[in-house]
């Protein structure tokens, strides 16, 4: 939409959150509230996004990308004052859409409808409204027929006006030229000395300007988040939206009540999510994979047909048709090629595991390069850290490591080689070689352990 801009108000302190973090930086479904609003605006192709910042400006600004323009509100003197700071930046902008950074449940289709009505009626202003069964504490929309009259705040409403269920959400479209003039006519008539943006509607009405409304069917879009309890309630709404979306896209979710998927996750059809699965960050799961139960993956990639059970993964790549778990721990830098098996109580860190290799149980593999068709026996440990530096272990294709092998890095095991159970290997092993390193077994005859009396 050319000649449009979005202005997102995010200057408030959020005192009720009782946090050192600015309110709009608290996360919902894995993303800051403000980012949800920015993403929504960009999905409807509004070319410019301005964020009005005040409290916590440095913290918020550090998270914004180059596409986002920052407008500074040095003193928080109300919503009208915030827009006054943004208007001088609206060069070659005919219309703006004003949103709140603490309303992350706004949807793209709602913004499209709001903009459409604004344009169709050549309105000076268009308000997004919602109908609440219990609108206590919210500003009411007064109309005569379908004609907007004004917004009445709860404290100023008559008993009859308080029965009105249609409320003001705080999201608006404005004609910039008309808004610029209207802002000159509002004054701070309250004890706080604040300029209220809603006062411009009275100015427009007095001038005979067109003011329209659009009532969203989803009341959750109107929810502003001002407390931890409200954040938790919004999290539940966002989670249900995400789960419903992926089920519509062909993902099987066995128990939605115990499944958590963040907004940045991507799933393909025929993925199955077992109970108590948590998918976070930029995790991607390919078709026919089965995740869970009791699995948490953060910024991981899972290939087609893989099974991941009772596992924690962070920044790991899992190839196709792998079997992971139960009780595996995949740390950052782990790359598993196709058909790899990682069994119970195995930890892998910063290592590449070749196709068809197996690490069945009770092992630690760190800073290692493992070839194809390698078998790593139970209890094998790569000793990669000397207290100062980390060192690399290389295990070539088709090597077989006996149980309880210790590999003291830097060390290389040649292709097709075997290590004897219980060996501590500190020197390179050539290809097709058996390496055994053991202490001599001793028998002490006629020895009887002293017993406690």
Curated annotation (Swiss-Prot):
Binding residue positions for Mg(2+): 102, 226
Keywords: Acyltransferase, Cell shape, Cell wall biogenesis/degradation, Cytoplasm, Magnesium, Metal-binding, Multifunctional enzyme, Nucleotidyltransferase, Peptidoglycan synthesis, Repeat, Transferase
Protein residues bound to acetyl-CoA: 378, 384-385, 403, 421, 438
Catalytic activity: alpha-D-glucosamine 1-phosphate + acetyl-CoA = N-acetyl-alpha-D-glucosamine 1-phosphate + CoA + H(+); N-acetyl-alpha-D-glucosamine 1-phosphate + UTP + H(+) = UDP-N-acetyl-alpha-D-glucosamine + diphosphate
Keyword Magnesium applies: yes
Needed co-factor(s): Mg(2+)
Cofactor note as given: Binds 1 Mg(2+) ion per subunit.
Region (Linker): 229-249
Pathway where this protein functions: Nucleotide-sugar biosynthesis; UDP-N-acetyl-alpha-D-glucosamine biosynthesis; N-acetyl-alpha-D-glucosamine 1-phosphate from alpha-D-glucosamine 6-phosphate (route II): step 2/2; Nucleotide-sugar biosynthesis; UDP-N-acetyl-alpha-D-glucosamine biosynthesis; UDP-N-acetyl-alpha-D-glucosamine from N-acetyl-alpha-D-glucosamine 1-phosphate: step 1/1; Bacterial outer membrane biogenesis; LPS lipid A biosynthesis
Cellular compartments per GO CC: cytoplasm; membrane
Principal localisation: cytoplasm
GO biological process: cell morphogenesis; cell wall organization; lipid A biosynthetic process; peptidoglycan biosynthetic process; regulation of cell shape; UDP-N-acetylglucosamine biosynthetic process
MF term (GO), any: UDP-N-acetylglucosamine diphosphorylase activity
Regions crossing the membrane: none
Region (Pyrophosphorylase): 1-228
Known EC number: 2.7.7.23, 2.3.1.157
Active site, per annotation: 361 (proton acceptor)
Protein location: Cytoplasm
Gene3D superfamilies reported for this sequence: Hexapeptide repeat proteins, Spore Coat Polysaccharide Biosynthesis Protein SpsA, Chain A
Purpose of the protein: Catalyzes the last two sequential reactions in the de novo biosynthetic pathway for UDP-N-acetylglucosamine (UDP-GlcNAc). The C-terminal domain catalyzes the transfer of acetyl group from acetyl coenzyme A to glucosamine-1-phosphate (GlcN-1-P) to produce N-acetylglucosamine-1-phosphate (GlcNAc-1-P), which is converted into UDP-GlcNAc by the transfer of uridine 5-monophosphate (from uridine 5-triphosphate), a reaction catalyzed by the N-terminal domain.
Quaternary organization: Homotrimer.
Family named by the database record: In the N-terminal section; belongs to the N-acetylglucosamine-1-phosphate uridyltransferase family.
HAMAP family the record matches: GlmU
Name this protein carries in UniProt: Bifunctional protein GlmU
Source organism of this protein record: Desulfitobacterium hafniense (strain DSM 10664 / DCB-2)
